[in-house]
Amino acid sequence: MPPKKKKITAIIKLQINAGKATPAPPVGPALGQHGVNIMEFCKQYNAATESQAGNVVPVEITVYEDRSFTFVTKTPPAARLILKAAGVEKGSGTPHRDKVAKLTPAQVREIAQTKLPDLNATTIEAAEKIIAGTARSMGITVGD
């Protein structure tokens, strides 16, 4: 007889700095209300993301009926990667009027390759268009 599948009670999505998960908010309250061992999650998450230090890494935590959990880390948000590549602190308040930085097509391609597994795109060209659109909506121009 095959083993029984665990019943899922919750799926929690968080964005946490890589290698810096602590039981303090926002991690503690989000996991605590589902009865998850918070310290155990923090240790596992920090070990899994220590190589990406300095980035915000989204994580999807699946909580099961017996209070056990599994998690999947995603790629950093496109907006964060764009800001880092452009070397600016934040995007423009009025993106269509004020431009704050410029990205080269090579930088856009690099970000698109990083984000491809999490994007709704099958080709690198489609991923580049998505990243370029995100950059434009932040007041960052794309071109040579």
UniProtKB/Swiss-Prot annotation:
The keyword Repressor does not apply. Pfam families: Ribosomal_L11 (PF00298), Ribosomal_L11_N (PF03946). InterPro entries: Ribosomal_uL11, Ribosomal_uL11_bac-typ, Ribosomal_uL11_C, Ribosomal_uL11_C_sf, Ribosomal_uL11_CS, Ribosomal_uL11_N, Ribosomal_uL11_N_sf. GO terms for biological process: translation. Keywords: Methylation, Ribonucleoprotein, Ribosomal protein, RNA-binding, rRNA-binding. One of its GO terms (molecular function) is structural constituent of ribosome. One of its GO terms (cellular component) is cytosolic large ribosomal subunit. The keyword Ribosomal protein applies. It comes from the Bacteria. One or more lysine residues are methylated. Belongs to the universal ribosomal protein uL11 family. Forms part of the ribosomal stalk which helps the ribosome interact with GTP-bound translation factors. NCBIfam families: L11_bact. Part of the ribosomal stalk of the 50S ribosomal subunit. Interacts with L10 and the large rRNA to form the base of the stalk. L10 forms an elongated spine to which L12 dimers bind in a sequential fashion forming a multimeric L10(L12)X complex. This is Large ribosomal subunit protein uL11. The lineage of its organism: Bacteria, Bacillati, Actinomycetota, Actinomycetes, Frankiales.
